Amino acid sequence: MIMDFVSFFEPASLLYAAMVFLSRVVDVSFGTLRTISIVHGRTTMAFWLGFFEAAIWLVVVSTIVQTVTEQPLLVIVYALGFATGNIVGIKFERMIALGHLVLRVISRHNSNEIAYEIREQGYAVTAFKGEGRSGIVTELYIVCRRRDMKRILKKVMALDPKAFYVSERAGEVSNVYRPIMQPMTGWRRVLKKKYHSPSSALQGFSGEGSSPSSLSQLGRAERHFPGTVLRCRPYVPFLVISFASEMRPPDTARAFSFGQRCGLARLTPPCISQRALHGTSLSGEALVSG
């Protein structure tokens, strides 16, 4: 027994134990993700996770059975890998945050401001009036992606630190409104382009590559969206005007009408008419003929 204990700490044995441990961690992590994928109805992901889980498990178990009598401490390594794999799988699933959830926010104060701010970020909010122990309260009903919950709650708590909220997993969802402009993080922030203001963009044009009619269209855009034109790029014989506006109704209807007259080349979000009806932010690019 003592000889088995000593031989376990030899370099070759330690490397073998590390491989068993890591393989078991990966195996169980795949199993955890597979179970969650089945619950969410993601059949393709569940299929491939189950395939690799079974393959890794078969290799590890067949190897352990052959050597466990010679190195009994591998049982502990195997068990530690199993336990660690559960934690790693749960942590990884929380990080990727698959699926959607229903978020209910109950507030006594600033409920209108909370609903407005959340809608301005691109989410749909339904408000209900109710009565609590201390008086009238408002319940805000929000369906969003799980990865967006922290962003929404941060805005809620900034407006009402005493707000009560509860979340639950959503099954099938017919339509989910997503944030219009995602904050750039990591490598995306490094690659982020610097936008120029309308005045600096106009100063950069010498008339070459853009016709007077294109510049007049840019002037129209500035009049319709004061302070919201982000940049303009000359593409002979076109001029692309990028704009982003956070307006309340009925300004969104006017913005949609202007976008139709200019001929929108790309819309963010795709369904701009629904966004206009909900009074949320509007962004896009107008491709204007020169």
Curated annotation (Swiss-Prot):
It is found in: Cell membrane. The keyword Oxidoreductase does not apply. The chain crosses the membrane at residues 15-33, 45-65, 72-92. Keywords: Cell membrane, Membrane, Transmembrane, Transmembrane helix. GO terms for cellular component: plasma membrane. It comes from the Bacteria. CDD domains: YitT_C_like_1 (cd16381). Pfam families: DUF2179, DUF5698. It is a multi-pass membrane protein. The keyword Hydrolase does not apply. Belongs to the UPF0316 family. This is UPF0316 protein DP2912. It comes from Desulfotalea psychrophila (strain LSv54 / DSM 12343). The lineage of its organism: Bacteria, Pseudomonadati, Thermodesulfobacteriota, Desulfobulbia, Desulfobulbales.
